[in-house]
Design a protein with these regions (language model features):
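Membrane-proximal stem/loop segments at transmembrane-domain junctions that anchor or position
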Residues: 274-370
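Membrane-interface alpha helices of multi-pass inner-membrane proteins
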Residues: 155, 199-214, 253-257
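Membrane-interface anchor segments at the N-terminal boundary of transmembrane helices
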Residues: 115-127, 343-415
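Loop-to-helix entry region of an early transmembrane alpha helix in multi-pass inner-membrane enzymes
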Residues: 74, 78-85, 90-134, 167, ...
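Membrane-interface transmembrane helices that cradle and orient dolichyl/undecaprenyl
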Residues: 144, 184-202, 210, 230-234, ...
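Transmembrane-helix signature of polytopic, membrane-embedded enzymes
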Residues: 95-115, 133-160, 178-179, 193-198, ...
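Transmembrane-helix motifs of polytopic, lipid-linked glycan transferases
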Residues: 119-144, 183-187, 395-398
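Multi-pass, polyprenyl lipid-linked donor-dependent membrane glycosyltransferases
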Residues: 37, 121-128, 156, 163-188, ...
């Protein structure tokens, strides 16, 4: 009993240490204007909720919500804007900063007079990230039944997050999606290891909440059902009735979470859907990458290696060789895709009615380019964690091989959803690692296991040598 209390206390201290490291890394970043990057997407919706009680499409509305009530929208999921609203209720200074930023975006005030203040969100981000790290560590410990792996995985996950501290200092969704996914993946591991209806229900609730944070996670619903079936039928040899009941329990819990949002969208917007225009906009921007030339295709593989790839390629081939991969350059794939999207919106008003025709035309003319280009995009998106990624990615590969050889299928099931999302982002989005931070979980867990096994083997050899010498 005393050992358990001590272990719990040590883990609490570890959690506080992780939080202290992450919150410090975020808070020491230079202050950001709240109109920078994609922050206005969510801040405008929060503003509309605060001042009009309307969940809108934010900056994608055609009305100035500082002057008139915006129409209801469903472009973004509701979780993150509501978190911003909660932060504005808790901190009046942040509320004033949000209002000023939105008013400046709509040219109602000068942006120079707005306060670059988002501390409550920064603290919230650090708390979410810490929860995600603990979930990764717990999942690794559960999969490999090793206390050492818990500590190693937690440390590696923290190290992998620090390079993105600047990203987390923006008022955007990355920290929340990372956290919710990591917790959902832990719940999935527990449910697959010891299947029970109650555990599967929790998995469904968490993955449903994830969809309300970022709609692209909708694709994981059938993936998780597939994993439940695969685990039950192939690994546990459970009866089909049991497997079916667990699959239905997941689906029911998932629908309980997203159902109210679907009903709200049907009543307020007139559409039975989770989102509108979101997927169409992303895919239209993704099609711009299909113009990638042969040199860009080949150089993408060394170029995307964190820390070393970009300077080496720029030195050997010049900065213009991969300039289209850098989103802020005028001729980047990002700007070309965004410009095409904006022109379509200007000409037609909406993208969803056009997307089937655009997909048909793209696949008819350049399907082979689309498939080939997805390879470097997935490769580039895979290298999460900055410099740490140079170690985490190969160690993850080793862990996958070891998992097959040593019958650790639970690790492969744990990794599968994040790998599916990597492929999805390469197919319908872009190559930026910010969308694939959920890979840190399986990467850190796998790397921790490999390191622990190497250390254990070295310790055994050392003891054997000492025994033989004596």
């Amino acid at each position: 009993m005393r050992d358990r209390v001590f272990d719990f206390g040590v883990r609490i201290v570890f959690a506080l240490g992780v939080f202290a490291i992450l919150v410090t890394a975020i808070l020491i970043r230079p202050p950001k204007w709240l109109s920078d990057f994609d922050q206005s997407f969510y801040l405008t919706i929060a503003y509309d909720l605060n001042h009009h009680g309307v969940f809108s499409n934010g900056v994608f509305d055609k009305v100035n919500s500082t002057a008139t009530v915006p129409p209801p929208g469903m472009f973004f999921g509701p979780v993150y804007p509501w978190l911003i609203v909660a932060a504005t209720k808790a901190d009046a200074r942040f509320a004033q900063a949000v209002d000023c930023s939105v008013q400046a975006t709509n040219n109602q005030v000068e942006s120079a007079g707005c306060d670059a203040y988002a501390r409550p969100m920064h603290i919230m981000h650090a708390a979410f990230l810490t929860l995600g790290v603990l979930a990764i560590a717990a999942a690794a410990e559960t999969i490999f039944t090793s206390g050492a792996v818990f500590w190693l995985a937690g440390i590696l996950a923290t190290l992998a997050l620090i390079p993105d501290a600047d990203l987390f200092s923006f008022v955007m969704t990355e920290s929340v999606t990372f956290s919710l996914y990591s917790v959902a993946a832990l719940a999935l591991v527990l449910a697959l290891r010891t299947p029970r209806i109650s555990r599967v229900l929790i998995v469904g609730l968490l993955f449903g909440l994830l969809c309300l944070t970022r709609p692209s996670f909708l694709v994981l619903a059938p993936v998780v059902v597939g994993l439940i079936v695969l685990n039950g039928v192939w690994l546990l040899r459970a009866r089909w009735r049991t497997v079916l009941s667990h699959s239905l329990a997941f689906a029911l819990a998932w629908l309980i979470i997203i159902g109210p949002w679907l009903v709200r969208n049907a009543v307020s917007v007139g559409k039975w859907a989770l989102t509108e225009e979101y997927g169409s906009a992303a895919l239209i921007e993704r099609f711009a990458f299909d113009d990638m030339n042969a040199q860009e295709f080949v150089l993408a593989f060394p170029y995307c290696l964190p820390g070393i790839g970009e300077p080496v390629v720029n030195w050997a081939f010049g900065q213009q060789a991969m300039a289209r991969f850098v989103y802020y350059t005028p001729e980047s794939f990002f700007h070309i895709g965004r410009s095409h999207r904006d022109k379509l919106v200007e000409a037609h008003g909406r993208l969803d009615p056009l997307i089937k025709g655009l997909i048909r035309d793209e696949m008819a003319e350049r399907w082979w380019r689309y498939l080939l280009v997805s390879l470097p995009l997935a490769w580039c998106g895979m290298w999460v964690g900055g410099w740490a990624g140079l170690a985490l990615v190969p160690l993850f590969g080793c862990a996958c091989v070891m998992a097959v050889r040593r019958s650790k299928p639970l690790f492969l099931l744990y990794a599968a959803p994040s790998v599916v999302m990597l492929g999805l982002h390469a197919a319908v989005a872009n190559h930026y690692t910010r969308y694939n931070l959920i890979l840190i979980g399986p990467f850190a867990a796998g790397a921790a296991w490999v390191v622990a096994e190497i250390a254990s083997a070295a310790s055994r050899r050392r003891r054997a040598a000492q025994n033989s010498g004596s």
